[in-house]
Amino acid sequence: MPLMTPPTCLPNVNTRQDYVRIYRDADVWLPAMQAICQRHGLDATQLEFAPPGTHIVFRVRPDRYIKLFSPLWGEDFVPERLVLCQLSGRSDLPIPQLVAEGEIEEWPYIIVTAVEGVSLDGVWRSMDASNKEYIAARCGELMASLHSTPTEGLETIAVDWPDFVERQIQNCIDDLIHADIDKQWIRSVLEFL
């Protein structure tokens, strides 16, 4: 009897263009997220796509997130996992706690707790100046606390700043293209960056 290959639940992504083309299509990622939920005893009926970002993120109601790392940027998995472990248990920082990790079809993933709050994207414009000042001050306090964290154990994280900056610029442009922003405006942003 011939060996049968198991069905795949993730798309074949070989290039950045492949990834960008399907990134925002939640239905593409749902089978993998359902499989991860089943593997870890989470309710797969409570999945909610949670872009934007470089990697695929779904919220599992009520209080978990699954982050799936594309093999194109698989090197992002280890540093994120190490930093989450390093910051675990800090009561002064609202940090997601690492619940589980694994791999599905050679795509690494983590499951973390949700940090309550709202995205500034949705509320910043409607906030008055005093609230914005409070948030800015609080962000400064959080950054100071984060920067005071010992870095022992994080030495293996290699940071190629030119590559990182280039990826951030490309991600920005991709987001603008997907938001259907005028191409002339995108060119202006690219010149600025």
Which residue stretches match the model-derived regions?
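Phosphate/pyrophosphate-binding loops and the adjoining catalytic core of nucleotide-dependent enzymes
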Residues: 2-33
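Short, structured coil/loop segments at alpha-helix boundaries
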Residues: 10-12, 71, 90, 128, ...
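A generic structural signal for ordered alpha-helices
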Residues: 7-15, 35-36, 44, 76, ...
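FAD-dependent flavoprotein oxygenase/oxidase catalytic domain
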Residues: 4-6, 15-18, 90, 95, ...
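An alpha-helical support segment within catalytic cores of ATP-dependent transferases
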Residues: 24-42, 116, 132, 136-137, ...
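Short N-terminal secondary-structure initiator segments
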Residues: 2-7, 48-65, 170-173, 177-189
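ATP-binding pocket architecture of kinase catalytic cores
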Residues: 45-160
